[in-house]
A protein has these predicted regions:
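Helix-to-loop junction immediately C-terminal to a conserved catalytic motif
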Residues: 56
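Conserved ABC ATPase "signature" region
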Residues: 100, 104, 111-129, 181
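Conserved ABC ATPase signature
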Residues: 133-137, 141
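Catalytic Walker B motif of ABC-type/P-loop ATPase nucleotide-binding domains
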Residues: 158-161
Length: 266
């Protein structure tokens, strides 16, 4: 089977108002197999989200190519579901309606869509919260609603852009375990962007490292050989986890410091 997503020698350059160009990503190649969980880590502003947007078909590369299950990608990647860092819930709709709306807009009868939405809410422990509006939910609860809002449409690929970034450490850990439970159930291809190296190792099969920008490149690709299923808290105290973290950090640290210097610490 061809990779779920394959980026080959992708470069992305943006035109500046001054007439010049800014190279965000340069010559990046990355393949994510069906059922594989791959995390991308790099300094702030290195182009991680840009690369994810290319995989989603939201940004066309300046050069290079993208294939989805072996077919060239032209336009939006309709095989993928995208979970952003910012919440995408409609504030005037209940949790149940927020989850069901994707099915309804795709033509599923309302009653059937709501029934499936209720089932999905149950899978993330929110069976009793379907009638609540987003402002009545905690940050972690809203993230769970957002996650099943994407998963209910059964995408073959899941693109995730720092989805747990705004959450506190304890809630991030809970969400990480929940994500792994859901992923273990059907093993979708996942491309997960994070700035947190520990999170990347704990969740993924592979950790891909990007250099500081501009013209960020993929400079490292590690296989995570930790056993599954995993518990986020427990796996972090394993010697093999700590050894891998030190090994990756030895490369990542220099890029983080370089990115920090380039942005003035912003």
């Amino acid at each position: 089977m061809p990779p779920a997503v394959s980026l080959s020698q992708v470069s992305v350059r943006f035109r500046l108002a001054t007439g010049g160009t800014y190279a965000a990503v340069e010559d990046a190649s990355l393949a994510v197999a069906a059922g594989e969980f791959v995390a991308i880590v790099g300094p702030t502003g290195c182009g991680k989200s840009t690369l994810l947007n290319v995989a989603a078909g939201l940004i066309a590369p300046s050069s290079g190519s993208i294939e989805v299950f072996g077919a060239p990608l032209g336009g939006l990647n309709r095989q993928a579901g995208y979970l952003f860092q910012a919440e995408a819930l409609f504030p005037w709709k209940t949790a149940l309606d927020n989850v069901a709306i994707g099915l309804e807009t795709a033509g599923t009868p309302r009653a059937q869509a709501r029934e499936r939405a209720q089932t999905w809410l149950g899978r993330v422990g929110l069976s009793e919260f379907g009638a609540r509006y987003p402002h009545m939910l905690s940050g972690g609860q809203r993230k769970r609603v957002g996650l099943v809002q994407v998963l209910i449409r059964d995408p073959r690929i899941l693109l995730m852009d720092e989805p747990f970034g705004p959450l506190d450490a304890q809630t991030r850990q809970i969400m990480g375990n929940l994500l792994l439970d859901l992923w273990n159930a059907d093993r979708k291809a996942v491309l997960f962007v994070t700035h947190d190296l520990e999170e990347a190792i704990a969740l993924s099969d592979r950790v891909v490292i990007m250099s500081a920008g501009p013209a960020a490149r993929i400079i490292g690709d590690w296989t995570v050989k930790l056993p599954r299923p995993r518990d986020i808290a427990e796996i972090k105290i394993e010697p093999a986890f700590q050894d891998l973290q030190r090994e990756i950090w030895a490369m990542l640290k220099a890029e983080v410091l370089r990115g920090y210097a380039q942005t003035g610490g912003g």
